[in-house]
Each structure stands twice: as C-alpha cells, then as structure tokens.
C-alpha cells in the first residue's frame, strides 16, 4: 500500500461500510452526491440514482453528511502486536542474562 493511501483507504472504507451519504467536489467545481459503493487506487464508484465512476485525480474534496470514525484498526492491531513481541523478546533477553 502506498504511504499516501494509509489514511485515504480506511476513511473511504468507513464511508462505504457505514453507507454515509457524501458530497464529492470535483476540481472543476461540480458537486456530486451519493454513497460510496466501491473504490480502488484510481476511482470511486458513487451510487445515487445512477452509478458514477469518478476518477480520484478529478476530486478536490470529499464531504460526508456526518462524522465518520476512520481509525485504521488493522494498523493499530499490528502496532500492538509488534510492541508485545518486542516486550516479550526484551523480557526473554533480560531473564537469560540473569542466569
């Protein structure tokens, strides 16, 4: 995953998963509204009365109708696991030096 997408993907996924209505403003000023059906590295599929494939390079701003919790739980779990492994390794090293 690209470094720039580490915030983008969880945010868009939360909007998709919770079916939060969004307003998407394009760089040319056009406002699109709907729900995010799907997305990938390059496009967002926006659903309203019709489905629209919107290229991300044309998007200026994504505005949700309400607040969204977009914490990257997977990254947080990985960090906690790594911290626990490091603490365990340090504990094992300390106990073997004491013997």
Curated annotation (Swiss-Prot):
Report the GO molecular function annotations: RNA binding
Keyword set, alphabetical order? RNA-binding, Stress response
Q: Does the keyword RNA-binding apply?
A: yes
Region entry Disordered: which residue ranges? 67-99
Pfam families hit by this protein: Hfq
Q: Which InterPro entries match?
A: Hfq (IPR005001), LSM_dom_sf (IPR010920), Sm (IPR047575)
Q: Tell me a GO biological process for this protein.
A: regulation of translation, ncRNA-mediated
Residue intervals of the Sm domain: 9-68
Entry's Gene Ontology cellular component terms = cytosol
Function text = RNA chaperone that binds small regulatory RNA (sRNAs) and mRNAs to facilitate mRNA translational regulation in response to envelope stress, environmental stress and changes in metabolite concentrations. Also binds with high specificity to tRNAs.
Q: Spell out the subunit comment.
A: Homohexamer.
Query: What is the official name of this protein in its record?
Result: RNA-binding protein Hfq
Q: Which organism is it from?
A: Actinobacillus succinogenes (strain ATCC 55618 / DSM 22257 / CCUG 43843 / 130Z)
């Amino acid at each position: 995953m690209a470094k720039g997408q580490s915030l983008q993907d969880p945010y868009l996924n939360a909007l998709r998963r919770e079916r939060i209505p969004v307003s998407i403003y394009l760089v040319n000023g056009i406002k699109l509204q709907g729900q995010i059906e799907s997305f990938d590295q390059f496009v967002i599929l926006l659903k309203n009365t019709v489905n629209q494939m919107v290229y991300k390079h044309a998007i200026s701003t994504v505005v949700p109708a309400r607040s969204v919790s977009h914490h990257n739980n997977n990254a947080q779990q990985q960090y906690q696991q790594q911290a626990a492994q490091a603490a365990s390794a340090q504990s094992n090293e300390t106990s073997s030096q004491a013997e």
